[in-house]
Amino acid sequence: MIDKESLKKCLKLYLVTDSEMLKGRDFYKCLEDAISSGITTVQLREKNASGREFLRKAMKLREITKRYGVKFIINDRVDIALICDADGVHVGQSDIDVREVRKLIGNNKILGVSARTLEEAICAKNDGADYLGVGSIFTTSTKLDAKSASFETVKEIKEKVDMPFVLIGGINLDNIDKLKCLESDGYAIISAILKAEDISKEVEKWTLKI
């Protein structure tokens, strides 16, 4: 079983990958720069990658994250998570059934689920999720069709669903202070870190801010 308190610490600064944000820069170097500077969990999420490319990136990132003692989560692809022995899987509401994922990965791997409403959060917990990705909190360029989750909804989820959660969606250093009142366990970041010219310095700024 996954220890809830240990998991909360791992969720503090959660980086979701998107190689298109890097504009041609070396994917592995950028990710290692981020990981070595304070990222606590990495989720491999490459929606436009072929299966072969996704697997290649997963195997290499598994090596890097292990070296730094950082948790490694695979988005959607349970098969690849098992092949590369990732720490866990994250699925959305329209992806594979959460209960089926839990059966496939067992009880010793982390299972994260996206949730926008209290109902989705409750279902995710009942179906075997270990943590929630709650959002989109703000408008985001990485998921244009993402519907927002209100602050009131987040507060309800925290109060009524006793499980770790990260906030996701359009979060940056200029608006993060607005989120402190929501008392999440961490923040899932994409563009605010990956678009930075100096990723190491950007991650260091985040570690000081949160």
UniProtKB/Swiss-Prot annotation:
Residues involved in Mg(2+) binding: 76, 95
Residues bound to 2-[(2R,5Z)-2-carboxy-4-methylthiazol-5(2H)-ylidene]ethyl phosphate: 140-142, 170, 190-191
Protein's name in the database: Thiamine-phosphate synthase
PANTHER family, sorted: THIAMINE BIOSYNTHETIC BIFUNCTIONAL ENZYME, THIAMINE-PHOSPHATE PYROPHOSPHORYLASE
Cofactor(s) required, per the database record: Mg(2+)
Gene name, Swiss-Prot/TrEMBL: thiE
One example GO MF annotation: thiamine-phosphate diphosphorylase activity
Entry's Gene Ontology cellular component terms: cytoplasm
Transferase listed as a keyword: yes
